[in-house]
From Swiss-Prot:
This is UPF0473 protein SERP1179. It comes from Staphylococcus epidermidis (strain ATCC 35984 / DSM 28319 / BCRC 17069 / CCUG 31568 / BM 3577 / RP62A). Pfam families: DUF1292. Disulfide bonds: none annotated. Belongs to the UPF0473 family.
Amino acid sequence: MTEHNHDAELTINNEEELLTLYDENGNEVLYRKMLEFYHPEFKKEYVVLAEEGAQSDDEDMIELVPMINEPDESGDGGKLVPIETDEEWDMIEEVVNTEINE
């Protein structure tokens, strides 16, 4: 993953990358990383994913899947875990809406 200066303010990386994850049935699902950012208030790195090839719905919306990226000891990659709090959900929604509108 991307190195960040974690003492700085909000850091955003919108370089796309493909990731393979597994669904609840153990099937491989390909996701595109749409956004990656570190938020200093929560002191966590987040990624926002969209299923590769996903079609927009009637309102031109594609489902986005936000996750927390917990880096491993070397700082490379790590594991993706679910969002933990309503405050994080609200913050992620604000960041995504800001990035989409720019």
